[in-house]
Design a protein with these regions (language model features):
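Conserved, structured core segments of small domains
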Residues: 1-114
Length: 114
């Protein structure tokens, strides 16, 4: 089953840049190792939240607003698509993402298979 991991953390770049250089290097190495994990099909960091646009269509009119759609206040910083044998394996993978232990969250959601 394929799972989407939505990585959310307000101010992630600022928090990481405030860490000592050796800690920044360790976290960077962790992210690189995660990208190389068997089963990772895709993943990337997103550009700054200030570059986001939100698109809605009302009565045939396209409305575009600046900024992200933020339901819970947490910024979407990146994502992974992970092919896991089951939900427990997907959760174990998500727990390895450094943001999960730094005050951010990783939402795990199965992709619909068609």
């Amino acid at each position: 089953m394929k799972y989407l991991m939505q990585v959310r953390f307000n101010g992630a770049d600022a928090v990481i840049h405030e860490l000592p250089a050796d800690e920044q290097m360790r976290i960077t190495a962790e992210f690189q190792a995660i990208r190389k994990t068997p089963g990772v099909l895709d993943g990337n960091q997103l550009e700054a939240v200030a570059t986001a646009k939100t698109v809605r269509v009302n009565d045939g009119e396209t409305l575009v607003s600046d900024g992200p759609t933020v339901a819970d206040g947490a910024e979407l910083n990146g994502y992974y698509v992970y092919d896991a044998p089951d939900l427990d394996a997907a959760i174990a993978f998500a727990s390895r993402i450094p943001v999960a232990r730094m005050g951010g969250t990783v939402e795990v959601r199965a992709l619909m298979e068609r």
